[in-house]
């Protein structure tokens, strides 16, 4: 998993509530267990018409937002079914950070596990960031995870909270497996302990 330390990128404004996981990645694309290749189908119903052509009025089909790495929405992002394909699709599209007033719990957790930083901010702050994003390609946001601050184009810093353990995992680029493997030496040492460590070792001498 790639480390997340500081991201300066285009943000896409999507002022919509209750964006569910079926909107993020429709069920017909869930047959794969690969984490890559889903980005082209992220928000498929909104991005494409019945003939597979892009809908020009959808934000992620517009410049500069087709290159966005930050997504700003309204409440309850990621509601619906608990498909992990949803953060896979966002990440494969290029999204590394999602900002909203609230998230569905499972989606929120799955974002962290897949290298996406979800940030909760009040709706009025989300509105301000969306206004920044609408200024175009020259209006980029900086998300600094080390300092836990979002820097607006005008230089104003907006602090955000994040769980310390999850922050550590993103800063180090660790998923659950990576976190386990970071303790490989301790695991190996434990595996080589006697199977009944509570039984004292007794040396029996030779009887003469």
UniProtKB/Swiss-Prot annotation:
Q: Does the keyword Lyase belong to this entry?
A: yes
PANTHER family reported in the protein's UniProt record: 3-ISOPROPYLMALATE DEHYDRATASE SMALL SUBUNIT, 3-ISOPROPYLMALATE DEHYDRATASE SMALL SUBUNIT 2-RELATED-RELATED
The identity of this protein, by name, is 3-isopropylmalate dehydratase small subunit
So, what pathway does this thing act in? Amino-acid biosynthesis; L-leucine biosynthesis; L-leucine from 3-methyl-2-oxobutanoate: step 2/4
Name the gene for this chain: leuD
Query: From which lineage does this chain's organism come?
Result: Bacteria, Pseudomonadati, Pseudomonadota, Alphaproteobacteria, Acetobacterales
Function according to Swiss-Prot or TrEMBL: Catalyzes the isomerization between 2-isopropylmalate and 3-isopropylmalate, via the formation of 2-isopropylmaleate.
EC category: lyase
An example Gene Ontology cellular component term from the record? Answer: 3-isopropylmalate dehydratase complex
Q: Which family does it belong to?
A: Belongs to the LeuD family. LeuD type 1 subfamily.
